[in-house]
Amino acid sequence: MERWSGVLRVPLHPNSRTFHRVGASLCLSPETRTLLVPKANAIFFCGDRVEGTGNPVIERLSNLQNLSEIIVSKFGSFTNAWVIEASAFNGPFAVYKDFIPSVNQYGEPSSYHPNGFPASTSTVSLLSNCLEEVRSVLPTPLHYMAKKVILGTQVDTKSGLSPSCSFSRSKTFILGFSKGGAVLNQIVTELGFSDIGSNANSPDVGQLMGRKFAGSEEIYVVPKTKEDLLNSISEIHYVDVGLNSAGAYLTNHDVFERISKRLMQGASELRFILHGTPRQWSDKRRDWIRNEKDKMLRLLESEAPKSGGKFKVLERFYFTDKPPSMQMHFEIIESLDAS
């Protein structure tokens, strides 16, 4: 699979004064080197910056381009990877203000509310702006090639067909690393309060495209609306998340009850995977992280049996025989078992 890879600097809104750095690794057509609809979009939210350690492992696993390539290796070559940094930092502390309005000056959330759906709306806007930026740097002759572009999806103007290796209705995998887990909590909250939508029982995304585009059948490289995003989420990965305050894991039972109800009403199946290391789960100075994780796991497991097998929950503990360290906190990304 041909790919376009790079690190983008894009605003969330056209008139925004702040920018997000986003590492991207995207599927390209081997024939035309134009963007393809992927089997899935894997969206990875980074945490605080860790600088000046002199540790080559931490530095390598803090590099957005490296991270995007690792994410592709975990989910497969037909996956687009998006590695998102916060737009604002207070020293080393990531502040995802546009995604979680309740955060303080250090990026720590006081609560998670669905009002306005800020995380899903911001994610859709950011990915759309990223695509526009990528399209602007693709070579012009290769970018157009007598094709019609629908947010980067190439459609033959004579046959109306997409390339044979494009996929219909891409799935979305959401990953939150360290403080990036707070963005996951906000997205999960919004998911619980969202409508199922028209694509809940859509054909499997693995089905190869071979049909004409007509109105509602248009497909997109990334979700076009917050509803499209939320309804496309099939996996949620908490990757060694933690905060210096409460709120590292979501412990609102009502949210998980609502998600379970969505699944019973026809939403596509959903997997939660909690990945951790001794760095976070065995930290005695921040014992609330382990307590919140255990509570969230119990809540998820209590709801899973109600969905007829559509709600799956997994817990994976890494480096259990090693003492806690900052290096293992980053190494979990490379060791991640996403199966």
Regions found by a protein language model. Name each.
Residues 47-51, 87-90, 179-180, 242-244, ...:
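Conserved beta-strand elements of beta-rich interaction domains across eukaryotes
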Residues 7-103:
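Short, surface-exposed "cap/lid" segments of acyl-processing enzymes
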Residues 138-269, 279-282:
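Serine-dependent carboxylesterase/thioesterase catalytic core
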Residues 68-82, 232, 262-272, 297-313:
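Structural alpha-beta junctions
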